[in-house]
A protein has these predicted regions:
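Hydrophobic, small-residue-rich alpha-helical packing segments that form membrane-like cores
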Residues: 3-6
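ALDH superfamily catalytic-core signature
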Residues: 8, 13, 20-174
Length: 174
């Protein structure tokens, strides 16, 4: 990124999405400062999705909620900064939501994204997989894993041991 930033001028705009640490490092680049380059940063977001009490199973709103949560969990392996990290559900609907999301996650196929039957690819690296596993274990100190498995993943068109694959995991905290 440094070589790209060395070429920016005052009429350019730099937009960054990622960690706050990296964003601050980029924003302090001499060219950004000296040329007064506008710098927009979206960092370390914690997005949520709230289900209303009237969005019960069988309603379009419930179906859209489940579809969006599944999509956010699986697009880019859930690793995009704007992904939903937390869902808030009325207590009376927790079981229904948990079951519906689990059913949708059961349909997710993991593997080589070049194959049309694959709906979720690998993470960036095995180090990232390990970090996610460690964070999930930390979260399970207060939340219960209700879907997924950190140690097993079924992969299509690739070797699960060679790639950075991790199945979607759903946690529940009452």
């Amino acid at each position: 990124a440094r070589s790209i930033l060395d070429a920016v001028e005052s009429q350019d705009v730099v937009t960054f999405t990622g960690s706050a640490v990296t964003g601050r490092m980029l924003k302090s680049h001499p060219r950004i400062i000296n040329e007064a380059v506008p710098f927009n940063m979206e960092a370390d977001s914690l997005n949520s999705c709230v289900l209303g009490e009237d969005a019960v199973p069988g309603t379009p709103e419930f179906d859209i909620f489940i579809k969006e949560v599944r999509k956010e969990m699986t697009v880019k392996c859930g690793q995009k900064c704007t992904a939903i990290r937390r869902i808030i559900v009325p207590e009376k609907l927790i079981e229904d939501v948990q079951i519906a999301i689990g059913q949708q996650l059961d349909k997710v196929t993991i593997g080589d994204p070049r194959l049309k039957e694959v709906s979720m690819g690998a993470m960036v690296s095995k180090d990232q997989v390990q970090e996610v596993k460690e964070r999930v274990v930390e979260l399970t100190k207060t939340a219960k894993m209700v879907h997924g498995n950190l140690d097993e993943v079924s992969v299509i068109g690739a070797n699960s041991k060679d790639g950075a694959f991790l199945a979607p995991v759903l946690l529940r905290e009452d």
